[in-house]
């Protein structure tokens, strides 16, 4: 699990070990600035799905759940209103990943991805499982029961436990 990492966090030996772990069926969960990490490592770029571009100030927005059959989203409301720091991405990951939820840019200011703004996604990647959410910047996120349940289910999914 990469929880709010930024920049280069693994050296070459650690990267090789991490790649072996994933290729042997290991799971990965990325939270928030995990998308602002390891820009020069192609394997990680594919694993994370999309890299961070920028963000507006923290504000309330509506998340629309697209895939409510995934364990991490099954217990969430179809329209989930949360306050957080909302990331824009360098490219849209749709097509490379299974988009679980999108951000409704009509409900906040500062979005740059228009009508299709994925905010959480999952995929199988080179033998392992990868799950990412752009949520989780604020301390309040980790006191929010729905967010914690969502994150816990994502961890279990990535581990292959559900």
Each model region followed by its residue ranges:
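Proline-centered loop/turn at the N-terminus of a beta-strand
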Residues: 27-29, 98, 129
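Extracellular ligand-binding/catalytic regions of CAZymes and related secreted enzymes
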Residues: 108-116, 124-162
């Amino acid at each position: 699990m990469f929880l709010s990492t930024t920049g280069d966090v693994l050296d070459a030996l650690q990267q090789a070990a991490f790649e072996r772990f994933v290729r042997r069926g290991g799971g990965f969960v990325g939270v928030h600035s995990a998308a602002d990490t390891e820009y020069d490592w192609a394997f990680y770029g594919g694993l994370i799905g999309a890299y961070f571009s920028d963000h507006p100030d923290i504000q309330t927005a509506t998340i629309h759940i697209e895939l409510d059959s995934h364990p991490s989203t099954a217990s969430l409301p179809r329209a989930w209103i949360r306050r957080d720091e909302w990331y824009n991405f360098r490219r849209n990951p749709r097509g490379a990943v299974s988009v679980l939820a999108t951000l409704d840019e009509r409900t906040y200011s500062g979005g740059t991805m228009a009508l299709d703004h994925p905010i959480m996604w999952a995929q199988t990647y080179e033998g392992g499982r990868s799950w990412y959410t752009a949520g989780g910047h604020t301390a309040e996120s980790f006191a929010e029961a729905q967010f914690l349940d969502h994150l816990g289910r994502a961890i279990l999914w990535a581990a292959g436990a559900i």
